[in-house]
Amino acid sequence: MHSISIVGRRYALALMEVAVDQNIVGQVMADFELIEQTMVEAKQLRLAIQSPLIQAYKKAALLKEVFGGKVSQQVATFLFLLASKNRAEYLPEVIQEYRALLDEQNGVISVDIKTAVDLDDKQTKQLKDKLEAYTSKKVRVHLATDKQLIGGLTIQIGDTVLDGSIRHQLAMLKNNLAAGALN
């Protein structure tokens, strides 16, 4: 695990423990989604939080100004703690790790699917249903289009990649021809 992920996971685990004790797991995730959305929309905020040149107390004040009254007291306190420990730049990783912990708790897995062409809603639902049957878990699908696949798709579930793309098939054919395995 990358050191950034280790820091993010450590803080996410601590917050999850508090959230479970106080029965606010869902509220914390809702607050994190608001924070995530705000940071996507407010580039200056994101840059300030990530900047090593801005002092920790200024980051704490900035987070309090932006999110005070908009998030639960527990999340506001957590943001202050993160900033005061000079760890505010890890906030995106903390959110990502918290979401992963929540998904794990709820039996949900994230699946990244790349296709050569856009899938319609019916195709996406069929694929999601098949993946849920295959994994015996609820699936959160993240779709992306990659024209370089030529055709077919790739599916990533955790560290496992299922590659059914034409690009992959052509690469395998090329390797087999080069190795003289084709008679």
Curated annotation (Swiss-Prot):
This is ATP synthase subunit delta. It comes from Chloroherpeton thalassium (strain ATCC 35110 / GB-78). InterPro entries: ATP_synth_OSCP/delta_N_sf, ATPase_OSCP/d_CS, ATPase_OSCP/dsu. Keywords: ATP synthesis, Cell inner membrane, Cell membrane, CF(1), Hydrogen ion transport, Ion transport, Membrane, Transport. The keyword Ion transport applies. SUPFAM superfamilies: N-terminal domain of the delta subunit of the F1F0-ATP synthase. One of its GO terms (molecular function) is proton-transporting ATP synthase activity, rotational mechanism. Belongs to the ATPase delta chain family. GO terms for cellular component: plasma membrane; proton-transporting ATP synthase complex. F-type ATPases have 2 components, F(1) - the catalytic core - and F(0) - the membrane proton channel. F(1) has five subunits: alpha(3), beta(3), gamma(1), delta(1), epsilon(1). F(0) has three main subunits: a(1), b(2) and c(10-14). The alpha and beta chains form an alternating ring which encloses part of the gamma chain. F(1) is attached to F(0) by a central stalk formed by the gamma and epsilon chains, while a peripheral stalk is formed by the delta and b chains. HAMAP family: ATP_synth_delta_bact. Pfam families: OSCP.
